[in-house]
Design a protein with these regions (language model features):
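Extended substrate-binding grooves/exosites of carbohydrate-active enzymes
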Residues: 1-117, 121-129, 134-142
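Intrinsically disordered, low-complexity Pro/Gly/Ser/Thr-rich segments with frequent PxxP/GP/PP motifs
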Residues: 131-168
Length: 168
């Protein structure tokens, strides 16, 4: 909403950059797709900075557990704002990083009237150079057909419509 309002005002001619968006604390980042779609609507939207990459939770003395807040014999507090990253302090992936990765995938596919529309979000690379698609069609948990999509020659920042060929 904030981004849409900014670009609705014709006087705003400068690019828009989100500062500390997607606060990655706990089970967060569920609105990443909403931010992505908003940025897609406006050419002047140039991204943002996720807060933040990793937790800052050191190991407790003589323990394999990481601590924060009052865990270090300091005054009890609600200081868990050091545990707000996409990865833990020892760089283990958190679920919100998987959400982020999925939203910012380099190729998106949409079904359209018996075709698949592919959009290549890569800036400099043809999709065929970076991506291969292997698919399986299943019925009652058994694979009935599988194959490879080889004609992914989609220029950077372009869209292609490919026929969807399903078995009879």
């Amino acid at each position: 909403e904030e981004l849409d309002a900014y670009f609705a005002d014709a006087q705003n001619q400068k690019p828009y950059l989100f500062c500390e968006y997607l606060h990655a604390m706990g089970n967060s980042c569920g609105d990443t797709e909403d931010y992505f779609q908003a940025m897609e609507r406006h050419a002047g939207a140039c991204g943002g900075f996720v807060w933040e990459w990793c937790n800052h939770s050191p190991y407790l003395p003589n323990s394999s557990k990481m601590g924060y807040g009052g865990d270090f014999n300091d005054t009890l507090n609600d200081g868990n704002f050091c545990a707000d990253g996409l990865v833990t302090a020892d760089r283990q992936i958190q679920s919100n990083l998987l959400e982020y990765k999925n939203v910012y995938r380099p190729l998106r596919a949409t079904l359209k009237n018996g075709h698949v529309e592919f959009k290549n979000y890569l800036d400099f690379t043809d999709a065929a150079e970076a991506i291969s698609i292997h698919y399986q069609i299943t019925e009652d948990f058994s694979v009935v057909k599988e194959g490879q999509i080889d004609d992914l020659n989609i220029a950077p920042k372009s869209t292609a419509l490919l026929p969807l060929r399903l078995p009879a």
